[in-house]
């Protein structure tokens, strides 16, 4: 299993092509290639070569399977949000806070369609700890917030494409997102 995405940091005008694969002990390994922001909605020949290289070197796929997989990749969704990151240097933990989460469906050429979902009045908090619970985790638990599984990609695909199964994300969608969800036409010219 692997994931390929581009990630753009609007404030710094940085863009990366990222390939996420499974490492030892179920750990996720993320490799990045500096990418042109203008290419964020497509896979360039250099980008395809990077994907193939990462899939082969991580032993995720054999060479031919990696080439076939990279050749079949096409844009499907644009996910945007505003992120704030806090670092707790004493224990090496970080916490990210994502607001204004928006998913927009793309066609196979990377062009926005008329399908867009905005999740309002919710903050997606992710804590990233080296080993044990951080002070942020304990504060969230004390306030009654329990961990919830969330893949922004899988959840976005499920809410944009009603025909896809929501199995794993059904509870998150119905209990956490539906009350704050606004289906809107996509922005034009963006």
Describe the predicted segments one by one.
Residues 1-190:
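Phosphate-end processing signature that detects enzymes handling 5′-triphosphorylated RNA
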């Amino acid at each position: 299993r692997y994931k390929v995405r581009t990630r753009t940091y609007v404030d710094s005008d940085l863009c990366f092509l990222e390939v996420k694969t499974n490492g030892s002990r179920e750990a996720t390994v993320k490799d990045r290639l500096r990418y042109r922001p203008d290419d964020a909605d497509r896979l360039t020949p250099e980008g395809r070569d990077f994907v193939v290289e990462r899939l082969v070197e991580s032993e995720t796929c054999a060479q031919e399977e990696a080439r076939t997989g990279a050749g079949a990749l096409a844009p499907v969704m644009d996910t945007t949000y505003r992120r704030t990151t806090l670092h707790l240097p004493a224990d090496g933990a970080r916490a990210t806070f994502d607001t204004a989460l928006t998913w927009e469906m793309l066609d196979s050429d990377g062009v926005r369609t008329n399908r867009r979902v905005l999740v309002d009045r919710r903050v997606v908090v992710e804590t990233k700890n080296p080993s044990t619970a951080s002070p942020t985790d304990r504060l969230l638990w004390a306030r009654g917030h329990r961990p919830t599984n969330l893949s922004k990609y899988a959840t976005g695909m499920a809410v944009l494409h009603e025909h896809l199964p929501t199995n794993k994300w059904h509870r998150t969608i119905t209990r956490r997102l539906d009350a704050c969800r606004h289906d809107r036409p996509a922005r034009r010219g963006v």
